[in-house]
Amino acid sequence: LALCLCAAPAAAQQPAPPARTGEALPEPGFWERLRAEARRFRELNANPFSYARRYRISHELASSIHDAARTEGIDPELAFRLVRVESNFNPRARSYAGAMGLTQLMPGTARSIDRSMRGARLVDPDANLRVGFRYLRNLLRHYDGDVRLALLAYNRGENRVDRDLRRGRDPENGYSGKVLGRGADRYRGAGVVQQ
């Protein structure tokens, strides 16, 4: 028994066994570089033509949506999802409430963002996309990058969403889930405004 008690402190002071050879730790910055490569890979695969195939739309329309999203600082994936839900990619779409075009802009909202948005410009695909995505970008900034709240405000109006939030109510009406679908986790807690 005395021998065991005396030997215990010596065992506790022994250094840990060396790592097995052949198991090298990743060099510093490895994971950051891997993430950057994965992002680049996703961007290469997310070109307008891949969206055209996925949504079965013309290459011209896919390029217009992709370019307008990039110009206005919106994640192209979110932009395509928004246009699909709003107009099903129909540039002449009109809602019963009076919303128009690919991004279903209300005339007053469109004019508040760009005063030239009147008449035929509301359904001009490039102008409608540009102003619709700028509006979404403004909402993303207003809601500190919260995509769910920005989409709800896009659908219901900023004043309604703000009022619900002030009153402690959840402004959810199902719209954000409809746009985000299975990709909702991708946007949770992360702003999509690209720099």
Describe these PLM feature segments.
Residues 13-14:
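Boundary of Sec targeting at the N-terminus
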Residues 1-7:
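Bacterial N-terminal signal peptides
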